[in-house]
Amino acid sequence: YLSFTATVSYAEQDRMVVALPDSGRIVDLQRQDALGVQLFFDETSYRLMFEALDRVIRARSGRLADLRDIFYTKAPASRYTFDAMRFPWLNASQEKAVNEVLWAKDVAVVHGPPGTGKTTTLVEAIFETLRRESQVLVCAQSNMAVDWISEKLVDRGINVLRIGNPTRVNDKMLSFTYERRFEAHPDYPQLWSIRKAIRELRQQRKHADSWHQKMDRLKSRATELELRIRSSLFGEARVIASTLTGAANRVLEGEKYSTLFIDEAAQALEAACWIAIRKAGRVILAGDHCQLPPTVKSIMALKGGLGKTLMERI
């Protein structure tokens, strides 16, 4: 009996395209006479938001506690005091916004109503930040928004590593996803061969010491290669891009960033923002709180304040 969780990419008439958790499942599926699909609601995002809020509430010290107090109390945000930089290709308000980002030690807001060049300003702010930092985290509430800002950064010549389910990423950014770059890495063919050997060895189901020793060696080598490929991809990337909930992806486990940029922050759920903020030393919010608020269908949740964003609070 074969059981695993996958993602439905799309379905039409009698055809369904399913994104598998790893390529090794393809071989397993080919051996099955019949397949069944059981659809269920994915509660992962809600679980991650609850966990993030719990950590924020429980924080007694450290950077997370500092940022929480800045957002929810009258604790002042700190600033650097160096001279303003000039960006002749930007207008005065855009130039001021970029400098506000560079001056911020804790939190900054880039407020950009439609037509004011908010995206241009944000890309410039990220570009200038990368002159001072080796890597930044860029997030947004939706995959569409993440892809949009990521495309602009790629057009600027910045190495972007897109984290997230490839079925939710647009065609232009697909080659920048972690999965595609992982499979394109020079060490991947060797890793694929080892994974294949592990699957074949499992089919033998022997219990001799030599069988276990060989399995252990193969697994150890596979893990070594996986870590080496991951280290290479993250070492080369200047921008790590994901949705807010995607910041909890297993490949980002343990990662910390000096700066987090949240685009379309006025449409981002407050609880989701904290998933990404937990990984950051300072936070830059970009958006327009006068536009549409985040989508919250529950009346009870709206009454409880879920419709209010961090951008409004700050």
Name each model-derived stretch.
Residues 116, 121, 125-154, 160-164:
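Conserved RecA-like ASCE P-loop NTPase motor core of nucleic-acid helicases/translocases
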Residues 1-99, 155, 172-196, 313:
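Pre-ATPase regulatory/linker segments immediately N-terminal to the P-loop/RecA-like helicase/translocase core
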Residues 112, 165, 264:
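The Walker A (P-loop) glycine that initiates the GxxxxGKT/S ATP-binding motif of P-loop NTPases
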Residues 132-134, 142, 231, 245-314:
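Conserved helicase motor core of SF1/SF2 NTP-dependent helicases
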Residues 72, 81-83, 87, 174-259:
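Conserved helicase NTPase catalytic core signature
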Residues 104-110, 134-135, 238:
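Pre-Walker A (Motif I) flank of P-loop NTPase domains
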Residues 89-90, 98-107, 129-130:
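Phosphate-binding P-loop
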